[in-house]
Amino acid sequence: MDTTIREYQDSWEAEIKSKLEDKFSGKIEVTKTETRRVYAKVLDKADIKEICKFVHDDLSFEHINCLCGVDYPAENKMQVIYEIDNYTFYRGVILELEVDVPYDDLHIETVSDVWGGANWHERETWELFGIVFDHHPRLERLLTPDTYEFFPMRKSYKLREDKR
């Protein structure tokens, strides 16, 4: 991993886009770039680990800021969103990856061995949405009691009626 610190250049987003699309043609689609931001969609959840390893090892994105789930019941899917930061080589540029996870197979590979910080984000996402991160070293609850049998961030989760 290159740890050279460089001053920001407005060509970095295009460079990152090009490297991702060249390496993963047909596996990733860069949907948007703007100053210090690159947005991309991973087309098949089976490719997420390989793409994340490349982003970490070859593009030097060394920190995962956020990993979260989003529920899209009308589309019969959830999404996992990865927000990844680079402090050195592409200093200050954030890469946001999104990947669809269909309701009928809520499994995706862990990236906690790529970025250690993903560990707790994946645990929280599993606990609140029910997305299973395969091969996670410790997929267990953080916030809710062990007796919970539902996932409170899913849109299908119903709050109790106010009976005041």
State each model region's role.
Residues 1-164:
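Terminal low-complexity/charged segments
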